[in-house]
Amino acid sequence: MLKVYSPHDLHLIREIPFSKPKEIERSLERAEKLFKDKKNHIPAWKRIEVLEKVVEIMESKRTLLAKLAAEEGGKPLVDSIVEVDRAINGVKIAISYSGVMSGEQIPMGQTMSSQNRLAFTIREPIGVVVSI
C-alpha cells in the first residue's frame, strides 16, 4: 500500500493499493491487443462524448476535487480550485482538438517527378501509453 500523508501536518490521508507487476503486464498486454485491432478504436464523436462526460463529472465534483488536492498538496484551497479549473479546461481543450486532428496536404508539383501527385499526412494513435 502507498501511504499518502498531508505535507501540512503529516496525517495519513489515504492508503492506495499498488498493482503487482504481473497485473500491470496483463493490463498492458490487453491494452496493446485491443489497440492493434482497429475495429476497437473509438471514433472521434464517441471520444468527444466521453470527454464531455468527464467535464460534467469534474464540474459537479469541483469542490471535492479541490479539497482533495489541497489536502494532498498541503496548499491553500484557493490554489487547488485554480488547479481543478485548469484541469477541467485541459479536458475542454482536448475536446476542441478531437474533431480537428486531421492531417495536412503536402505541396507537390515542384519537380517533374512530383507532377500530378498527391501527398498528405494523417494523424493517428501510435500505441499504448502508461502514466503514473
Model-derived features: where do they sit?
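N-terminal Rossmann-like NAD(P)+-binding subdomain of aldehyde/semialdehyde dehydrogenases
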Residues: M1-R117
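Substrate-binding/gating loop at the entrance of the active-site cleft, primarily
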Residues: Q110-I132
